[in-house]
């Protein structure tokens, strides 16, 4: 099982704001990846920073990724499509410079195509051209790329097609899978918050995640997954905005449980889209560690049960049944105990005793400055 976690952008806690400084902080936190959000044209003042990030990623075995323009209209008019492709070209150039492993792109509104085969075919044709452009950039015969050693020895960035979070945008899970299935060099970017929102809050249990990843694996035959995760506020099947994970009905614990218990075959990159960025990335890492700890505890119990069964000649199933019965009895006992605990105390008698004790002479009262009586209110905590 391979799981890499990181934030979408420079960490909030980073004192500097450059990509390289962000990478340093991410590595110090024990995270292993990052998704750069800078998609501007590579100008002289940016080149040095991007190149340094690429060198660091190459030397530190750090997975660098990049996110393309958030606003794209690949299904729009010729002018809108041309404008979007120009922005994507800048992203592809930046991806080469920073040694990005994945390039995440959006498609945009359905436009005049509407839902259906025509829209999917148009998207597939556009992304085929984008994949070809990435290969052209990576294998430019006119330049040996002496400052980009990862280009000569590596493979081009993979184009990620992200699932959208709104009904009016192209990018349902089924649409993305269909296009990826037909365009080599592309992968689905599973934005869990978007899938959860479009499904009216569908991602609730570890079984839900099992069905999701099995569906993708069976559809396109991959074990490599690139995912975004965050909390999300959603209404009527549409994502409204991202939230921190703890303030959403989209919980990370079921995904952590699936990854640990049933996701041994996964090679997964998880990017935190949360407003808390690296803080929620660390929260996800902690939940995965907790799931691993629970798994170890369960296996230890099973080992002890098998050893005891061998010693006593009892079946493992019988021992497990007895443990469950004992646990049930303990639970029932804990529930019944509070009903038996409150017993009426003879408070009036105690008060009378106090009155009787207070009847001796005034001299006695003055001598007993410190009272060690068990009923002294000052001794009640």
Indicate residue ranges for each PLM-predicted region:
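N-terminal pre-domain/capping segments
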Residues: 1-93, 187, 297-338, 357-362, ...
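Hydrophobic faces of well-ordered beta-strands that scaffold small-molecule active sites
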Residues: 3-9, 34-36, 64-68, 103-105, ...
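Active-site beta-loop-alpha junctions enriched in small/polar residues
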Residues: 8-12, 37-41, 69-73, 108-110, ...
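Gly/Pro-rich active-site loop or hairpin
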Residues: 16, 114-117, 170-173, 196-267
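Acidic (Asp/Glu)-rich catalytic clusters
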Residues: 23-28, 45-65, 92-97, 132-135, ...
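Active-site acidic/histidine proton-transfer and metal-coordination neighborhood
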Residues: 59, 75-189
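C-terminal helical cap(s) of enzyme catalytic domains, especially alpha/beta-barrels
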Residues: 278-293
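Intrinsically disordered, polybasic Lys/Arg-rich low-complexity tracts
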Residues: 341, 345-363
